[in-house]
């Protein structure tokens, strides 16, 4: 229900230079209900509700001619006001787009600093392999939640291939029990948090490569030195 996006927003707000840059987020969500929640929370409607409530509280702070002073919010209203303003500022710095409904068929030429994912447990291995494929092009981070059995019991070729990839990439794996015991879709299954940091590939300029090859061709050899 947008918890991943909300957590990223809060972490991003604490970074240096946050006020100068927008947080660009592309979402891929196959569940129509969850897509509608993302639309509501991050694509306009929530911002309008925040603005209206802030306007109502601001009116309470206007100058009161009867008491010849500015009114003050009570402690509950003041706490609400601070929270609303903080959320409003975070949303102003967020540029979120729902770009696709199926990660398996998702294609993009963008470079993503981070792919954060909570794929369906049934085929989470395929989703994570797709994320690795995307990030290997330009480098980047991956944070993925999988059913722990996907890693601990690699009984299929795809699972075995994934485990091998994770070893090659020196991925960090943390096992967590009861991570979803209090969620709306409750499950007590143990999960694995996969942490992958893929370095950017080294790319040499094609211009320098051509100059180097040209120099090798033109360089005189002992046989033709006079």
Task: Outline where the language-model segments fall.
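Class I S-adenosyl-L-methionine-dependent methyltransferase catalytic core
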Residues: 1-226
């Amino acid at each position: 229900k947008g918890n991943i996006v909300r957590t990223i927003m809060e972490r991003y707000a604490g970074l240096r230079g946050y006020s100068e840059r927008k947080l660009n987020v592309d979402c891929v969500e196959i569940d129509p209900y969850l897509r509608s929640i993302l639309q509501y929370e991050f694509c306009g409607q929530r911002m309008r509700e925040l603005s209206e409530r802030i306007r109502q509280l601001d009116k309470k702070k206007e100058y009161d001619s009867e008491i010849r002073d500015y009114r003050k919010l009570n402690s509950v209203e003041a706490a609400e006001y601070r929270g609303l303003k903080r959320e409003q500022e975070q949303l102003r710095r967020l540029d979120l787009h729902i770009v696709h409904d199926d990660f398996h068929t998702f294609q993009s030429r963008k470079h993503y600093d981070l792919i954060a994912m909570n794929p369906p447990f049934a085929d989470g291995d395929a989703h994570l392999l797709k994320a690795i494929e995307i990030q290997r092009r330009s480098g980047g981070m991956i944070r993925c939640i999988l059913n722990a059995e996907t890693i601990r019991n690699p009984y299929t070729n795809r699972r075995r291939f994934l485990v091998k990839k994770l070893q090659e990439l020196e991925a960090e794996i943390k096992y967590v029990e009861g991570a979803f015991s209090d969620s709306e879709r409750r499950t007590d299954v143990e999960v694995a948090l996969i942490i992958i940091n893929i370095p950017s590939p080294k790319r040499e300029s094609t211009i320098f490569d051509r100059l180097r090859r040209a120099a090798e061709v033109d360089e005189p050899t002992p046989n033709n030195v006079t």
